[in-house]
Amino acid sequence: MKFGPASPAEAIGGVTVHTLRQGSLVLKKGTTIGPAEVEALQKAGVAEIVVVRLEQGDVSEDVAAASIAQAVTGEGITVERAFTGRANLFAARAGVLVIDRAAVDRINGVDEAITFATLPAYKPVVEGEMIATVKLIPFGVEAKLRDAAVKAAGHGAMRIAPYVIKRVGIVSTLLPGLAPKVVE
């Protein structure tokens, strides 16, 4: 990645590093500069903005977060569209959250730019509950780091084990001297 100042016309394709407010113009951090943004910047009298550009071999924070989130997702889990480098994972059904803790540690050990956080293992969850998040700290990472995190996930680092109704029986033995109220 390369950071640096640019005129609005030179900024096309770059991503804003900071939120920019100039009069009625507001460009949020992470906005990709296109022709419409250049026109708005010029109208607002902005001469220079700081942008980041991905280099050959880099992937954007959203692409990386989405890829890693898909890799960790197992049965009973859905992934929200990645935004600002974050992909949130949700329970698609009620059940118990089962996590491969070693896979979580492997993913987090790939690089400090990649973070994977989950609820505690074996926690009961309900449908729609957020159970984990993948977050990329910088605006992008090298594709090889994303690929290493995907590989570290294995074949789904987490899943929701559904609740299953089972039949049970009770065998009760009456012993001499046992009070009847204990059995009732």
Language model regions located:
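Short, glycine/charged-enriched secondary-structure capping and boundary segments
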Residues: 41, 147-148, 183-184
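Short, low-complexity N-terminal leaders and the immediately following helix N-cap/first helix
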Residues: 1-84
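Glycine-rich phosphate/diphosphate-binding loop of Rossmann-like nucleotide-binding domains
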Residues: 154-184
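Residues in well-ordered beta-strands of folded domains
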Residues: 21, 50-52, 90, 132-134, ...
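Extended, charged alpha/beta regions that create polyanion-binding interfaces
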Residues: 55-163
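Short, mixed-charge, low-aromatic patches
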Residues: 20-28, 143-150, 168-174
